[in-house]
Amino acid sequence: MVFRRFVEVGRVAYVSFGPHAGKLVAIVDVIDQNRALVDGPCTRVRRQAMPFKCMQLTDFILKFPHSARQKYVRKAWEKADINTKWAATRWAKKIEARERKAKMTDFDRYKVMKAKKMRNRIIKNEVKKLQRAALLKASPKKAPVAKGAVAAAAAAAKVPAKKATAAGKKAAAQKAPAQKAPAQKAAGQKAAQPPKAQKGQKPPAQKAPAPKASGKKA
């Protein structure tokens, strides 16, 4: 932002420290680079030389000739209504609040604390009401859905189709050995039979069954 507060004739300044601290004055003439001739006819400040280091320039400018007498300065001050405009600025309000805070007692600070807590509670409740109303408008009521259907839909949405087919194949492969268990047992029983004779070897002779004993003697 461009700086526009320059030292000039008619510029209104705020006295920050010194015997006239907190009052407004108007620059009537510039003496040198360090001092200016000021006058405050409506703030009870006599015409005198004042250093720039104790002045803070404001945005207000009065229209009167160079080295004008006090009556012309007063007339321009009242015409521009400087006192009312200054009281309405944020600068003046901050100064007033700072002075009021410095004069507060312990009981005054306690009352301010309780008032702030009450204000914050009211604001919080109102914000919650607005949030609930916004949620009700944003999400209309839907028909109730069974929990199982909701879980299945969520699982289907999370698991892609390829992964689902792979999982189905794995499950089928795991179930297949359990069904073929009897066949494996049968194969084990067949393996218990005597091995076949290899080529060039005679099969082992099998004993003929013994004849049954009869009651007649030869």
Swiss-Prot record:
PTM sites of type Phosphoserine: 139
The keyword Repeat appears for this protein: yes
The Sequence repeat ranges on this chain: 174-178, 179-183, 184-188, 189-193, 196-198, 199-201
One GO term of the biological process aspect: translation
GO MF annotation, one: RNA binding
Keywords: Acetylation, Cytoplasm, Isopeptide bond, Phosphoprotein, Repeat, Ribonucleoprotein, Ribosomal protein, Ubl conjugation
Residue ranges, annotated region (Disordered): 159-218
Annotated spans, 4 X 5 AA tandem repeats of Q-K-A-[PAS]-X: 174-193
Modification type N6-acetyllysine: residues: 79, 85
Subcellular location, principal: cytoplasm
Organism domain of life: Eukaryota
GO CC term, one of those recorded: cytosolic large ribosomal subunit
Subcellular location as annotated: Cytoplasm
Chain spans, region 2 X 3 AA tandem repeats of K-[GA]-Q: 196-201
Pfam families listed in its UniProt record: Ribosomal_L14e
Cross-link (Glycyl lysine isopeptide (Lys-Gly) (interchain with G-Cter in SUMO2)): 124
Residue numbers bearing the N6-succinyllysine modification: 85, 207
Stored InterPro entries: Rib_uL2_dom2, Ribosomal_eL14, Ribosomal_eL14_dom, Translation_prot_SH3-like_sf
Subunit structure: Component of the large ribosomal subunit.
Similarity annotation: Belongs to the eukaryotic ribosomal protein eL14 family.
Function per UniProt: Component of the large ribosomal subunit. The ribosome is a large ribonucleoprotein complex responsible for the synthesis of proteins in the cell.
Protein's name according to its UniProt entry: Large ribosomal subunit protein eL14
Source species of the chain: Oryctolagus cuniculus (Rabbit)
Upper classification of the organism: Eukaryota, Metazoa, Chordata, Craniata, Vertebrata
The gene coding this protein: RPL14
